[in-house]
């Protein structure tokens, strides 16, 4: 088989912004180089919707899906501060593919496929992206002050309890289930 490796990089040009170094809590500047076309393609392979669609087709072919089955993939949009990485970068290309795949699954597999746009989360990978640790630390503080902060488990529990992933799912104008509300 082929091994693909995803990268969190911009497309087009290098991205430089302020960054919070979590090792020593210092603020400095950090840069990320632009991705090559091969890195963009590999990131779409890893983080796009191809595997999701293959799994859903396999479940349909095995006749193990109920008539009213639905499926959901998680996504993230974030602040304009992070757009060069998340929205316009390699992961943005993968997320666009994921969103297109949701439509394909709905039409071709016959299963309601949804995208849940979730709140920001600091991971080992995202902590290496300029501005993200600083942005997330401020975001978490504001969410806590406004009593809207929730952990990952609470967010997904709310997704299934409040957003109703059935026929009457609550979505925005793009058809996305917004958990970053």
Positions of PLM-derived features:
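Active-site loop/lid in soluble adenylation, ligation, and acyl-transfer enzymes
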Residues: 1
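Catalytic loop of short-chain dehydrogenase/reductase
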Residues: 4-110, 117-134
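C-terminal helical subdomain
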Residues: 47, 104, 108-116, 133-181
């Amino acid at each position: 088989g082929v091994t693909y490796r995803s990268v969190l990089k911009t497309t087009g040009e290098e991205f430089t912004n302020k960054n919070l170094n979590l090792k020593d809590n210092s603020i400095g500047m950090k840069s990320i180089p632009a991705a090559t076309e091969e890195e963009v393609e590999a990131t779409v392979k890893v983080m796009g919707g191809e595997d999701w669609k293959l799994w859903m087709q396999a479940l349909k072919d095995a006749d193990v899906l109920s008539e009213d089955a639905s499926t959901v993939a998680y996504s993230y949009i974030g602040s304009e501060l992070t757009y060069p990485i998340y929205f316009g970068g390699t992961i943005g290309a993968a997320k666009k593919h994921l969103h297109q795949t949701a439509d394909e699954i709905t039409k071709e597999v016959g299963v309601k496929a949804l995208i849940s746009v979730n709140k920001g989360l600091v991971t080992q990978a995202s902590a290496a992206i300029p501005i993200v640790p600083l942005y997330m630390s401020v975001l978490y503080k504001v969410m806590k002050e406004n009593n809207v902060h929730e952990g990952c488990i609470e967010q997904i529990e709310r997704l299934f309890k409040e957003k109703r992933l059935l026929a009457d799912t609550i979505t925005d104008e793009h058809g996305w289930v917004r958990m970053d509300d």
